[in-house]
Amino acid sequence: KKVLIDLKQISKKKFFKGLKFSNLPILMGVLNLTPNSFSDGGKYIKKNLGIQHAKKLIKDGCDILDIGGEATNPGSKQIKEDVEWKRIIPTLSKIKKLRKFVSLDTRKSLIMKKGLKFKINLINDVSGFEYDTETIKVLKKTNIPFVIHHMKGNPRTMQKNPKYNNVVLDIYDYFEKKIKYVRSKGIKHNNIILDPGIGFGKNLKHNMN
């Protein structure tokens, strides 16, 4: 019953600090500072190209800039923290000067801690806190909004014949467990976004459902 109440409160959330919800969609512009992301891998890793693209995303109407330095598309391999941060820092340091709502896409607690020093507004962990158990401690300490993302398996395995009893109900059950988990770790706020993870451990039929 408590989890159901939490889910209703999260779904009715009207705003986060620096971001208001209304009847209009909120657009997130994705900036992949990687050589191997599926949509724009390698396009923005060179000097100044990342910030130039960020400005274009803002001009095109994006409310959130989601910046990441590690590809998590199907078949991608994990990278070391120092490599990920080296990709992110040149652009992140400039993006915050644009005074926009910035989301940091990372699975690693160390990258989160470093990003928080640049006053990021949101943490987007596609692993649902399963990759690095220290991430939940970072979230509790900072009280920052975050995304609970659903992914079946990991980036290397998630598209290898994913199966569900009922994809909608299974994902709902997953979010129930995750909310129970974050509550058990002492996170009381409802600054939470639930992402069903379209394309992450799901075939076309799963995605359409």
Describe the residue ranges of each PLM region.
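N-terminal amphipathic alpha-helix/helix-capping segment at the start of soluble metabolic enzymes
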Residues: 1-35, 180, 187-188
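Conserved beta-strand positions in the central sheet of alpha/beta enzyme cores
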Residues: 2-5, 63-66, 103, 124-125, ...
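Glycine-rich anion/phosphate-binding loops
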Residues: 3, 8-11, 39-56, 82-86, ...
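Short beta-strand/loop segments at the ligand-binding rim of alpha/beta enzyme cores
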Residues: 24-27, 96-105, 121-122, 189
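Conserved anion-binding
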Residues: 27, 33-39, 71-75, 112, ...
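Conserved, mostly hydrophobic/aromatic
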Residues: 31, 57, 61, 105, ...
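Glycine-rich, proline-tolerant flexible connector loops at the mouths of alpha/beta enzymes
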Residues: 38-39, 63-91, 198-204
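Alpha-helix-loop-beta-strand connector modules within alpha/beta enzyme cores
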Residues: 77-104, 110-114, 141-151
